[in-house]
């Protein structure tokens, strides 16, 4: 993996974790962003999360907040084109 992509993924992970925490949704309590993977063309960002409570509810809450999270990423991370966010449970992460 190129340094640039790894660095960008780290920035996106950090920014997303902070923005998710700022949502103050009770379904997102004790939710951790474990990893992010940017697709080769940069159009999709797979976000792997672990919820210590109701995981399905947390994934639904994140999907509903996708537009708000992308807008927040636009303010924090400089990218030519922002990716679509795809929220997945941590156990489904690629090896």
Curated annotation (Swiss-Prot):
Subcellular location: Cytoplasm
One Gene Ontology cellular component annotation held by this UniProt entry: cytosol
Gene Ontology annotations of biological process type: maturation of SSU-rRNA
Top-level taxonomic group: Bacteria
InterPro entries in the record: KH_dom-like_a/b (IPR015946), RbfA (IPR000238), RbfA_dom_sf (IPR023799)
Keywords: Cytoplasm, Ribosome biogenesis, RNA-binding, rRNA-binding
Pfam families xrefs: RBFA (PF02033)
Coiled-coil annotated residue ranges, if any: none
Gene Ontology MF term list: ribosomal small subunit binding; rRNA binding
Entry keyword rRNA-binding: yes
Family under the similarity heading: Belongs to the RbfA family.
PANTHER family to which the protein is assigned, alphabetical: RIBOSOME-BINDING FACTOR A, CHLOROPLASTIC-RELATED
Function field: One of several proteins that assist in the late maturation steps of the functional core of the 30S ribosomal subunit. Associates with free 30S ribosomal subunits (but not with 30S subunits that are part of 70S ribosomes or polysomes). Required for efficient processing of 16S rRNA. Probably interacts with the 5'-terminal helix region of 16S rRNA, bringing together different domains of the 30S ribosomal subunit which aids assembly.
Subunit structure as annotated in this protein's UniProt entry: Interacts with the 30S ribosomal subunit as a monomer, binding in a position overlapping the sites of the A and P site tRNAs, and displacing segments of the 16S rRNA. Probably contacts 16S rRNA and ribosomal protein S9 and S13.
HAMAP family: RbfA
Stated name of the protein: Ribosome-binding factor A
Gene behind this protein: rbfA
